[in-house]
């Protein structure tokens, strides 16, 4: 019988799809990484999502964030992506927490997650979220820095001890090591970020090509 997740079922099997449908994933940070993550999870058949972000869609988000449209500027990012997830799968259970994750208020952000996606920018909050998940036995993956990088084919999933070419990885690795943690799963790119001169050259090339 045809259903929205038939292709996933064909690829992964009925048991795996059933497991996904009963899984609860939390995404912290609904920006350039988090918004696309939410979409992939919803389209992949995950049955329950919690979306955490206190920000609203701005004009500068239009170039890279799935939640950003002319019609959504000024709206909460978590709320926009929650509605989009429901448009994909009306049966999905999606909850928004429109707040800023921080150590002093961490308890209100946790609730029976099977997996957590860390797409937070601020290092102190990022590290606290990682530590909080580890203490609770919740699997977590962290997105690291991709600013001013342009080759998506270089993205890697790795242990943080194996990362290179990422300033954010260096800082997070140091902070975790100070807390006795040496292993953590991350998504990173070893590509060196473009310098301002390179960015300007790219913009000029794009402008010339358009002419």
Where do the protein language model's features map onto the residues?
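N-terminal charged helix/coil linker that caps or initiates catalytic domains
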Residues: 1-26
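Conserved S-adenosyl-L-methionine
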Residues: 43-48
């Amino acid at each position: 019988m045809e259903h929205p997740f038939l292709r996933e079922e064909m690829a992964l099997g009925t048991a795996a799809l059933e497991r996904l449908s009963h899984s609860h994933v939390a995404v912290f940070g609904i920006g350039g990484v988090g918004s696309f993550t939410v979409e992939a999870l919803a389209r992949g058949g995950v049955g329950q999502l919690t979306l955490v972000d206190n920000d609203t869609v701005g004009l500068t988000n239009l170039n890279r964030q799935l939640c950003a449209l002319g019609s959504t500027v000024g709206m909460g990012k978590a709320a926009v992506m929650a509605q989009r997830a429901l448009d994909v799968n009306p049966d999905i259970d999606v909850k928004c927490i429109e707040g800023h994750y921080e150590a002093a208020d961490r308890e209100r952000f946790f609730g029976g997650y099977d997996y957590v996606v860390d797409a937070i920018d601020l290092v102190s909050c990022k590290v606290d979220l990682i530590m909080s998940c580890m203490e609770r036995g919740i699997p977590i993956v962290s997105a690291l820095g991709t600013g001013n990088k342009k080759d998506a084919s270089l993205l890697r999933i790795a242990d943080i001890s194996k990362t290179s070419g990422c300033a954010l990885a260096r800082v997070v690795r140091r902070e975790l090591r100070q807390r006795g943690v040496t292993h953590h799963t991350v998504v990173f790119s070893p590509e060196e970020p473009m310098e301002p001169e390179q960015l300007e050259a790219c913009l000029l090339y794009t402008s010339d090509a358009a002419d």
